[in-house]
């Protein structure tokens, strides 16, 4: 049967590096209540203040990593889409972005018009967060309601500890670890701490001591930090990397609120001060290289590390469109449970 579509969903990107396009993208992204989780009037005020200077700054950053074909994240996601067409045997493989184009609404509407009633929704985020996974699911629900679409959805669950994901990481990163290096830093995207507190169903575990490695399953199921730490530990164990030669940090802090620590910026300085000369950095929260990996780590992070006394920071590419990753992702999608 070929009546079951697969919809891959990633974050998105501005349409171009023009300031106006970047402003439009940032406005859509930051006004999402799952991203900035404060009441609408305050969120509108805060985002309006951010949009005074941030679009020009971000446009410059995007321009520094933009490819001839377009946004690296979009280009790489399209390549993964093509690779998945060789693996998914049940119907078409489509790609949507949560922000920007092609939108979830555009793609779901087209699939409905083509007669598809079964869709596997695949948010391309290994670890759970409301600002990534939940917002994708809720947007799909909104579209179905608004358009009165007759569709059933299976939803790919966070796969932070799944053997397929860990194996794909291992095979992708292994060649880089075969070269001499002093330390491996696993830099995950950060989140405000309040996002974690809100999602602790017990109200007893979040950020208390090192609860992430001992919390019960019901807590871990919605704890981004716990899932990041467990992803890192599973990867290091599979690779046989000794304790002390790898560590975890969190990047991309926005605003003044307390975010998950340790911050990647601080960790880069600490590692250089500890005598680390050759540093490898991988970003396991991202399945495709993007501004947060290429510019924030590969450019600015590398410069910061050298200024702090290090000699070389090597950014390990994300999974991107690696054929082995496509095979493993297909296995994950095949067993996505029916949810919507």
Swiss-Prot record:
Keywords: Cytoplasm, Heme biosynthesis, Iron, Lyase, Metal-binding, Porphyrin biosynthesis
GO molecular function, one term: ferrochelatase activity
Keyword tRNA processing: no
Gene name of the record: hemH
Protein known as: Ferrochelatase
Any one annotated GO CC term: cytoplasm
Transmembrane segments: none
Function: Catalyzes the ferrous insertion into protoporphyrin IX.
Annotated EC: 4.98.1.1
Compartments, as annotated in UniProt: Cytoplasm
Natural source organism: Pseudomonas syringae pv. tomato (strain ATCC BAA-871 / DC3000)
Any GO BP annotation: heme biosynthetic process
């Amino acid at each position: 049967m070929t009546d079951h579509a697969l919809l891959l969903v990633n974050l998105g990107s501005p349409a171009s590096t023009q300031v106006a396009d970047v402003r439009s993208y940032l406005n859509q992204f930051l006004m999402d209540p799952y991203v900035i989780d404060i009441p609408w009037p305050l969120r509108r005020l805060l985002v309006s203040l951010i949009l005074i200077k941030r679009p020009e700054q971000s446009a410059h950053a995007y321009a520094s990593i933009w490819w001839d074909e377009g946004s690296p994240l979009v280009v790489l996601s399209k390549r993964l889409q093509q690779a998945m067409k060789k693996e998914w045997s049940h119907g078409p493989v489509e790609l949507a972005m949560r922000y920007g184009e092609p939108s979830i609404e555009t793609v779901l509407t087209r699939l409905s018009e083509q007669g598809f009633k079964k869709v596997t929704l695949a948010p391309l985020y290994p670890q759970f967060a409301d600002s990534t996974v939940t917002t994708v699911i809720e947007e799909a629900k909104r579209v179905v309601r608004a358009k009165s679409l007759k569709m059933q959805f299976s939803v790919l669950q966070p796969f932070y500890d799944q053997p397929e994901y860990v194996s794909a990481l291992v095979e992708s990163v292994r060649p880089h670890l075969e070269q001499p290096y002093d330390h491996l830093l696993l830099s995950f995207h950060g989140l405000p701490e309040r996002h974690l507190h809100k999602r602790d169903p017990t109200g007893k575990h979040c950020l208390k001591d090192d609860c992430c490695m001992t919390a019960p399953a019901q807590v871990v199921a919605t704890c981004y930090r716990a899932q990041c730490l467990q992803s890192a530990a599973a990867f290091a164990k599979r690779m046989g990397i000794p304790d002390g030669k790898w560590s975890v940090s969190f990047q991309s802090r926005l605003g003044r609120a307390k975010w998950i620590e340790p911050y990647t910026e601080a960790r880069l300085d600490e590692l250089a001060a500890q005598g680390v000369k050759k540093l490898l950095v991988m970003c396991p929260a991202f399945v495709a290289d993007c501004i947060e990996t290429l510019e924030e780590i590969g450019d600015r992070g590398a410069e910061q590390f050298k200024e702090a006394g290090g000699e070389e920071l090597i950014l390990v590419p994300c999974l991107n469109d690696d054929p082995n990753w496509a095979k493993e992702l297909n296995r994950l999608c095949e067993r996505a449970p029916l949810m919507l």
